[in-house]
Structures are given as C-alpha cells and as structure tokens.
C-alpha cells in the first residue's frame, strides 16, 4: 500500500526534492493506504528524502476513510487524484504533483499566498528554513504554467479554481530567489495590491545579442 503525502507535507517533500524532477505515475498504480502508520510514513520519508519531516505528517486517504487528527499523523479523506498527478518518491511513498498540490492548497491560501507559492514552484529555488540561506537553488522549475493550465482544465468549468486562475494569470516564471519573486510581484501587480502595474516580459531569460561588425 502507498502512503500519499498531502498539503504542507507534500510541499515540504517537493522542496526537499531539490533538483530532482520526478516523473508522474498512473493513478491506477497507486493503492492508497486507508490506515497509514506514522512510524512507517516517517521511515519511508527518511529513506527517500533528506532530513526529518516536520510533524505532523499530512497524508491523503481514500474518500470515506476515518479522519485522524492530532499526534504524528493527520489524514485527509479525499477522492483519487487525476491520472498523472502523483509522483513516486520511493516504493510505498508518493506525493502529488506541484499542480495537484496547488489545487489541494487553494482553499487554505489567499490569492497572494498562492501566487507567491506559484512563483517558487515555477522558479529555480526552494524555500528551505533548514538551509543556511533559507533556500536552495535548483537547475530547473518543478512546474510549468501550461502544466497547471492543463490540470485546471480537468475541473470542467471555467468558474472553478478562481483563486488559482487569478494567480496563474499573474505569475512570472523563472524567479531564482524569494527576493526576486517579491520584486517582480511588486513591479507587476496592480496598484490596489501594492504594486506598480508594470508589464514584466520574463525573468532570467537568455538574451541574444548581435555581435558588432
């Protein structure tokens, strides 16, 4: 049986993946554990990811399973994730893709919080409080805008996921640090949100310069 991390624990796992971009696995290949054990979950984490996870661990269980709160493990009964929206961390442990994680977190975060998180997932850094600089660099983003657009398209209705769609319309991929993310949002957001309303073409993109003859 597979333990599927969720919410803040899934975000922590994605941040600890660093430069590794996992390939999604089919939802039919994941048999979710209905009654996950906290000790087994922690042991699987330590075999797949660096460091000790923050407690409590948040995990997804099948719809209708008992809800567990308190202690070292919190369970979230939910429907099965869409096909291709699960990443295998090791045998027995998985987490949602970045796009699926944003869908999970949408009800819990404000529009601006979602936008800041989107900047991180679409950038080349991961927030890591345990790291000396509070972040670590990675060579490529974990999420592309079109991947999130595809995931939101599965909702079926244009009125679904309004906060995520709002954030996606304003996200600028390619940020290399939290400070860059804050700067680009300050420049690009409208004045009512504390920004300057400037058009930002992109971040950290290559620029071809013609040689001087």
Language-model segments: which ranges?
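Surface segments flanking catalytic/ligand-binding clefts of nucleic-acid enzymes
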Residues: 137-213
